[in-house]
A protein has these predicted regions:
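HhH-family (HhH-GPD) DNA N-glycosylase catalytic core used in base-excision repair
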Residues: 10-197
Length: 197
């Protein structure tokens, strides 16, 4: 859930993500620390990685982000490295394979959305050259405008999913509080949201 549209609040706590991660014990196997420190909010250049993040955000709906991070490798394997062309070609046999895979979220609507969205990204690439170029071309938009655009092109394009996807990939601010050391690292990577400030 977004707090004032500026920073992710970790569910069932009153903390933002940075504060939540800071409370984790050093010996934990919780994957949030690594994700917070090395991925969350950092710009992504590769279309397949952008697609992966979108699929994970979609699958997180109604579940915890910690669960998504724990299942990330299984998702990568099951979705063939999130190769957009490969996923776009998935047929009913592939859908049945995914529905039988206990390593991922076995939700037909979410699986169908991933395949549909891969096909949409293929069409976007024909016009813009890449999914990233499409995102860059439409930047800057506010969250409401992004949601409207995503709903026009993708399945599962609601406000929370789109907001988190764009925050986690550097298109919207708010992944980290300004006092978080990772915030400066992200600024050094020149995220798109910083261009609009």
């Amino acid at each position: 859930m977004l707090s004032d549209g500026l920073c992710f609040n970790f569910p069932s706590t009153n903390m933002n993500y940075c504060e939540f991660v800071a409370t984790l014990p050093d010996d934990t196997d919780n994957p949030n620390q690594h994700y917070h420190d090395t991925q969350y909010g950092f710009p992504i250049e590769d279309d397949n990685e952008l697609f992966e993040r979108l699929v994970l955000e979609i699958n997180q709906a109604g579940l915890s982000w910690t669960l998504m991070l724990k299942k990330q490798r299984a998702f990568q394997t099951s979705f063939k490295g999130f190769d957009i062309d490969t996923v776009a070609a998935f047929d009913e046999a592939e859908i049945e394979r995914l529905l039988a895979d206990a390593g991922i979220v076995r939700n037909r609507l979410k699986i169908n959305a991933a395949i549909y969205n891969a096909r949409q990204i293929k069409q976007i690439r024909q016009e813009y050259g890449s999914f990233k170029n499409w995102l860059d071309t439409h930047h800057p938009l506010d969250k409401a405008e992004w949601v409207k655009l995503f709903k026009k092109h993708f399945k599962f394009g609601g406000g929370e999913i789109v907001g988190e996807f764009l925050m986690s990939t550097g298109y919207l601010p708010g992944a980290h509080v300004e006092t978080c050391p990772v915030y400066r690292e992200i600024l050094a990577c020149r995220p798109k949201w910083a261009e609009a400030v």
